[in-house]
Regions:
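Non-catalytic carbohydrate-binding regions of carbohydrate-active enzymes
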Residues: 459-460, 464, 468-469, 480-490, ...
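Acidic/histidine-rich catalytic neighborhood
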Residues: 479, 483-540
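Short, small-residue-rich loop/turn micro-motifs
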Residues: 428, 449-451, 455-457, 500-502, ...
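Well-ordered alpha-helical segments within folded domains of soluble proteins
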Residues: 377-387, 447-458, 525-535, 593-602, ...
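Inter-repeat boundary and helix-capping residues of tandem alpha-helical solenoids
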Residues: 329, 447-450, 625, 684
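Aromatic-residue-lined binding/catalytic grooves and analogous aromatic/hydrophobic interfacial grooves
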Residues: 1-442, 457-461, 478-481, 495-496, ...
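Non-membrane alpha-helical structural segments and their capping/turn regions in soluble enzymes
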Residues: 283, 330, 334, 451, ...
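Charged/polar positions within long, soluble alpha-helices
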Residues: 298, 345, 486-489, 539, ...
Length: 784
């Protein structure tokens, strides 16, 4: 059904959260499709504040023993207060903190005939093309826009029945200047040398050095029309066919190189991009673009049976009607899945930067939370759908960023802790900042981030079976494990734990003082991440035939692994988030960090440890289903792991609540009219989390049987309300590609293709079956 792969409205975007996103992994464009002032909000993935910097003023190696002693004595309030003073120093240009992602600015396409009748605008996800049409005083007006990965430019073409006049302008909150000449105009900007979250930006360091410089170059091509520069604008008279090409380049090279020393002539690169695009022409670029996107998008699509009444309804209106229904319209469920994959293709391509809190889209100088890499859930959640929904190539930017993290993290580990290996904390940026941020320790101090990001490495191997890849990445795995191994301390019983320890952005109540506290001994998330990393490192070493005898660290990991403190089940039957019977500060907190072992990891499963799995389920029940947008995405996928399809769907229903962009209306978690996830504000991780969750409701492959087979669950959490549908191209660990089809009449067909030899056990609603598949083999499962 077309509505399940299309965003559609009958009015221009009223604000940024109604605009449609286009992207080629590097350039992001938000399309308003206005009639009088048609705004295109532009961004580019290297436009960050800051400069290379390996200074870490917070040094903890001499402070940790004192904090550990206080925690050992149960003096949680005193330990938390002292730690806050250490981490809570207000940052400034001399204080190293994560940098912010910066907008490029807004292209304005101003027409002289704003009147419009019969207005429609549409984002075709399969083609990654925005189209708009209406009738004005000059007759029928239509436009087509896309961001081309093959041609490295943003393209917009506007055609009208009769000639129109236009003015093209540009504005930006970033420091810079606009100039125009011939049929081109340019915005030459410079990112702040320092800026943090929503605070004031500083454009020069104390030494007079500046941030990343960039150019936005716009070329207007209008056959038969007059195009002229007028001050800082282009004026176009008498155009029936206007083609706009936009290139954006910067002088960012890598995390070590000062921008001014990069040797990158970004202005010349812009000109080369525009020249090549103009020479190729609109039709050829559109054809190359749709072929490029289709090769990725068409691998996996979800189509659900839906009433005809949902077809052709504007997306915003469909969302508006959702709260009054018991279940979210199945059209929206399928659209949510397909849109998440679309966003990944648009925001993360080989050779580009990893997606941040807002993907690659931003209209602010200092956006919320800096639109940075938030590593205690959000950055990792961005890539949850990559493997399961068949977009493994889109992981490459995040993998490249892991190398940056590891490089800078080695400096941080030595300077801050005096320890080997590499570390990573809560916030980072394009420069790879790896130290604690300033602020409350329950988010500023979290040294296990390296362990979480490294799970992408082993997951890639489990899906691909690529030994060369694993060998290439093993030193990164080893370095993360080396740091966390050295960070561990013994408790009174000789068990190993982290201390001080936090559980991201959550705290507990000190039983003695009644005060809110931030740090404990051995939070469950810390130990789940460390346990998984040690197991992964040892497993990888075995696959690569790296002997323990030849690597003392591996011997240490093997000795430490069984000594890690085990999860604690509290008297109420829930998992202890903070290591023992410490009461939660907020039982309904948005983070569910103590359930890391359920998802994304596979530490707590019904096969491996049913008691802990049951305690995790009780813990999720206490936390509750309603939360911020991204947090509901995590809850959906947890419910899928607990095989609760109907409850997972109910959370998706709440996730599809329309959030108002302006004053009034719903302000909790949900989606905006353009389907962007609302924390609020917009955070893209909720979109990716929801897409991964929908895939997990239909296919799971994270478990292994006692005899070593990959356990594949089919329809593990299918809601009763999804009467029929089909999904293609899902990926399972072990190298399987799976198509699933089901009908309201009870028919089921599962088609399985194997990339490589493997041993599997399949669990379906109609029975179980083991199978040994050869590379290129095919298996079809259906009820007898």
């Amino acid at each position: 059904m077309k509505s399940q792969e299309t965003l559609f409205e009958i009015a221009p975007a009223a604000d940024w959260n109604e605009a449609y996103p286009l992207g080629n992994g590097r350039i992001g464009a938000m399309i308003f499709d206005g009639t009088a002032d048609d705004v295109v909000a532009l961004s580019e993935d290297t436009l960050w504040a800051g400069r290379p910097d390996s200074e870490y003023p917070v040094v903890l190696k001499d402070t940790l023993p004192m904090l550990r002693r206080l925690l050992r004595e149960g003096r949680y309030t005193e330990a938390s207060d002292r730690f806050w003073k250490i981490c809570g120093e207000k940052p400034g240009p001399g204080f190293r903190d994560s940098a912010v992602f910066v907008t490029a600015g807004n292209l304005h396409i101003i027409a002289d005939d704003p009147a419009a009748r019969g207005y429609t605008r549409m984002l075709d996800l399969r083609r990654a093309v925005d189209t708009c049409s209406y009738t004005g005083t000059c007759g029928k007006v239509s436009s087509t826009a896309f961001c081309s990965y093959p041609d490295a430019v943003f393209v917009k073409r506007i055609r009208s029945a009769r000639a129109r006049n236009y003015r093209l302008g540009f504005d930006s909150p970033v420091k810079g200047s606009v100039s125009a000449t011939g049929n081109e105009f340019f915005f030459d900007g410079v990112c702040p040398a320092w800026a943090r979250k929503t605070e004031t930006a500083t454009y020069e360091t104390a030494d007079g050095l500046t941030g990343i410089a960039f150019r936005v170059a716009v070329r207007a091509i209008a056959p038969g029309a007059a195009v002229a520069a007028a001050d800082d604008q282009l004026v176009i008279d008498g155009a029936r066919d206007l083609l706009l090409l936009v290139a954006i380049r910067s002088n960012f090279k890598d995390c070590d190189t000062n921008p001014e020393d990069s040797g990158i002539d970004f202005r010349a690169l812009c000109r080369a991009d525009l020249d090549a695009a103009e020479a190729r022409g609109f039709d050829a670029m559109l054809k190359a673009h749709t072929k490029d996107v289709g090769a990725l998008y068409d691998r996996s699509r979800l189509i659900l049976d839906a009433p005809v009444s949902e077809e052709g309804v504007p997306t915003g209106r469909l969302i508006e009607g959702s709260p009054g229904k018991r279940f979210a319209p199945t059209t929206l469920i399928a659209l949510l899945y397909n849109f998440g994959r679309y966003l990944m293709i648009a925001s993360s391509r080989p050779g580009t930067r990893a997606t941040n809190l807002q993907g690659i889209w931003n209209n602010m100088l200092t956006p919320p939370w800096g639109s940075n890499y938030t590593l205690n859930i959000n950055a990792e959640m961005n890539y949850w759908p990559a493997q399961t929904t068949n977009l493994a190539e889109c992981l490459e930017p995040f993998e490249s960023q892991i190398r940056v993290f590891a490089k800078q993290g080695a400096v941080a580990a030595e300077k801050i802790y005096g320890l080997p290996g590499w570390c990573l904390h809560h916030n980072s940026d394009i420069w790879g900042f790896a130290g604690p941020a300033s602020g409350c320790p329950w988010w500023a101090y979290w040294p296990v981030g390296g362990g979480w990001v490294c799970r992408k490495i082993m997951e890639h191997y489990r899906f691909s079976g690529d030994n060369a890849y694993l060998k290439q990445w093993f030193p990164i795995l080893r370095g993360a494990a080396e740091f966390l191994s050295a960070l561990l301390v013994e408790d009174d019983e000789g068990k190993l734990m982290t201390s001080p320890s936090t559980s991201p952005e959550h705290g507990f109540i000190d039983p003695e003082t009644g005060e809110d506290c931030t740090c404990c001994e051995g939070s469950l998330m810390d130990l789940s991440i460390i346990r998984e990393l040690f197991e992964t490192c040892l497993e990888a070493a075995g696959i690569l035939r790296v002997g323990i005898a030849g690597d003392p660290l591996l011997a240490t990991l093997a000795e430490q692994l069984p000594r890690l403190r085990k999860p604690v089940i509290k008297a109420d039957g829930c998992l202890s988030e903070f290591g023992n019977e410490l009461p939660d500060k907020d039982p309904h907190h948005r983070h569910v960090s103590h359930l890391y072992g359920v998802y994304p990891a596979a530490e707590f499963t019904s096969l491996r440890n049913p008691d802990l799995f049951r305690a995790a389920w009780r813990s999720l029940n206490v936390r509750g289903d309603l939360s911020t947008g991204w947090a509901m995405g995590w809850r959906v996928i947890l419910r899928a792991r607990f095989l609760e399809g109907d409850r997972a769907e109910r959370i998706l229903h709440h996730l599809l609540t329309l959030v108002s962009s302006g004053p009034g209306g719903h302000r909790g978690g949900g989606v905006y009219r353009n389907m962007f996830d609302a924390h609020p504000p917009f955070q893209i991780d909720g979109n990716f989390g929801a897409t991964a969750a929908i895939a997990e409701m239909l296919l799971q492959s994270h478990e292994t049987t006692d005899d070593g087979r990959t356990l594949v669950r089919l329809f593990p959490a299918l809601p009763k309300n999804w009467k029929g549908g089909r999904i293609t191209g899902l990926r399972a660990r072990g190298g399987l590609t799976i198509d699933i089809r089901w009908g309201s009449d009870g028919t089921r067909t599962v088609t399985i293709k194997a990339d490589r030899d493997g041993r599997f056990h399949f669990i379906t609603p109609w029975g179980e079956r083991s199978a040994d598949l050869k590379a290129g083999g095919r298996l079809v499962l259906r009820p007898a």
